[in-house]
């Protein structure tokens, strides 16, 4: 059984997830207290939370409440980021800006997966591509993401640019990201 103290937060992973509103967080906390357990597991990769950051924060206030952890297997950090984006895109309450950011981030990360040719810890052949070997995939990252979300490649391109802009704004002015990716933008 995983202990709460063993769970780690990666800021990049957490930043892909739109935080719930105060009311939503409060309702989740009340539900957890009423049930006396966390109904949905916290999902991790190598001990880092990829889904369940809010549940984790609530559990830190009430460490006696039982919870479950499911460890996912991803071959790289990029695959974990793609999973986070896809998981978040499954939410019903996303604003158009949140959806655009996640689609852009997914496309950007899919490209990084394709361009990864191994490092000092992995063989290039394990990465799925070998340097100087042509990429034999029929469609590029944009067309793949566009097909997954029922949109056009040009929309995915604009979404990538939007996501890069949001991340640049966040780097320049911490907290600026919330203006574009949260309900506060309304």
Language model features: what each stretch is:
Residues 1-72, 79-93:
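Short, charged/polar connector segments at secondary-structure boundaries
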Residues 14-17, 30, 39, 50, ...:
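Intrinsic-disorder/low-complexity regions
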Residues 91-179:
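Alpha-helical interaction elements
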Residues 72-73, 159:
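Residue-level "edge-of-site" marker
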Residues 74-75, 139:
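Conserved aromatic
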């Amino acid at each position: 059984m995983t202990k709460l103290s063993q769970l780690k937060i990666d800021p990049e992973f957490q930043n892909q997830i739109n935080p719930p509103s105060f009311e939503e967080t409060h309702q989740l906390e009340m539900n957890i207290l009423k049930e006396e357990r966390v109904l949905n597991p916290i999902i991790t990769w190598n001990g880092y939370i990829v889904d369940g950051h809010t549940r984790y924060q609530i559990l830190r206030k009430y460490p006696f409440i039982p919870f479950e952890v499911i460890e996912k297997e991803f071959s790289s950090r990029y695959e974990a980021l793609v999973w986070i984006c896809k998981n978040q895109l499954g939410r019903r309450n996303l604003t158009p800006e949140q959806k655009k950011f996640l689609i852009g981030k997914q496309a950007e990360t899919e490209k990084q997966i394709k361009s990864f040719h191994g490092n000092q810890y992995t063989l290039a052949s394990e990465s799925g591509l070998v340097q100087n070997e042509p990429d034999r995939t029929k469609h590029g990252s944009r067309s793949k993401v566009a097909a997954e979300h029922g949109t056009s490649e040009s929309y995915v391109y604009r979404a990538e640019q939007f996501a890069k802009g949001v991340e640049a704004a966040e780097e320049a002015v911490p907290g600026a990201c919330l203006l574009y990716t949260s309900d506060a933008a309304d």
